[in-house]
């Protein structure tokens, strides 16, 4: 089973494709989709094209994204909400459904601590997948953690 994890962002969007076989999870591909700092419509178009390419290249069985979180800057929250809405619609059009996890759920699942910092999440992601080198940037690590969380929630599924 192939799982796509997505860490939404308006400038950078991390993604990861994992393979889940019984009790083993393997990293197939992970990367960063960089959005040019243009207007929202241009960024949404870039994001949609990138999502199309991922779905065309991989036979995805499950999709999981990080849900919205609180931020202090209302403009940032508004822009991210618009972008997430576009991302959600694109996934629904191409795939049909997706799972959502809060940052606290993801951190707790991967590290055992809901208040873990990004370096702790990155450490555990590497350990769980048997990766020795650093995974950068952290948007990519977050996308992998999202996919791992979804894989763990599908325990009975092969």
Swiss-Prot record:
Q: Keywords of this protein's UniProt record, alphabetized?
A: Cytoplasm, DNA damage, DNA recombination, DNA repair, DNA-binding, Endonuclease, Hydrolase, Magnesium, Metal-binding, Nuclease
User: Which positions in this protein are listed as binding Mg(2+) 2?
Assistant: 66
Coiled-coil residue windows: none
Give GO cellular component annotations, separated by semicolons. cytoplasm; Holliday junction resolvase complex
State the EC number(s): 3.1.21.10
Top-level taxonomic group: Bacteria
Q: Which GO terms describe its biological process?
A: DNA recombination; DNA repair
Catalysis: reaction(s):
Endonucleolytic cleavage at a junction such as a reciprocal single-stranded crossover between two homologous DNA duplexes (Holliday junction)
Binding of Mg(2+) 1, residues: 7, 139
Question: Per the entry, which co-factors are needed?
Answer: Mg(2+)
Keyword Hydrolase in record: yes
Q: Which GO terms describe its molecular function?
A: crossover junction DNA endonuclease activity; DNA binding; magnesium ion binding
Q: List the active-site residues.
A: 7, 66, 139
* Disulfide topology: none
Subunit and interaction comment: Homodimer which binds Holliday junction (HJ) DNA. The HJ becomes 2-fold symmetrical on binding to RuvC with unstacked arms; it has a different conformation from HJ DNA in complex with RuvA. In the full resolvosome a probable DNA-RuvA(4)-RuvB(12)-RuvC(2) complex forms which resolves the HJ.
What HAMAP family is this protein classified in? RuvC
- Family, as annotated: Belongs to the RuvC family.
Protein's name in the database: Crossover junction endodeoxyribonuclease RuvC
Q: Which organism is it from?
A: Campylobacter hominis (strain ATCC BAA-381 / DSM 21671 / CCUG 45161 / LMG 19568 / NCTC 13146 / CH001A)
What's the gene?
ruvC
């Amino acid at each position: 089973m192939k799982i796509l994890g997505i860490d939404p962002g308006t400038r950078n969007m991390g993604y990861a494709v994992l393979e889940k076989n019984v009790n083993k999870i393997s990293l197939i591909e992970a990367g960063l989709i960089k959005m040019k700092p243009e207007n929202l419509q241009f960024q949404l178009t870039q994001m949609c094209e990138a999502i199309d390419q991922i779905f065309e290249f991989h036979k995805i069985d499950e999709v999981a994204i990080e849900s919205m979180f609180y931020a202090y800057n209302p403009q940032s929250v508004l822009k991210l909400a618009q972008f997430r809405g576009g991302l959600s619609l694109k996934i629904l059009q191409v795939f049909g459904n997706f799972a959502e996890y809060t940052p606290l759920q993801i951190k707790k699942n991967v590290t055992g601590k809901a208040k873990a910092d990004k370096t702790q999440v990155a450490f555990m992601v590497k350990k769980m997948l048997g990766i020795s080198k650093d995974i950068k940037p952290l948007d990519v690590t977050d996308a992998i953690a999202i996919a791992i969380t979804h894989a763990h929630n599908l325990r009975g599924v092969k």
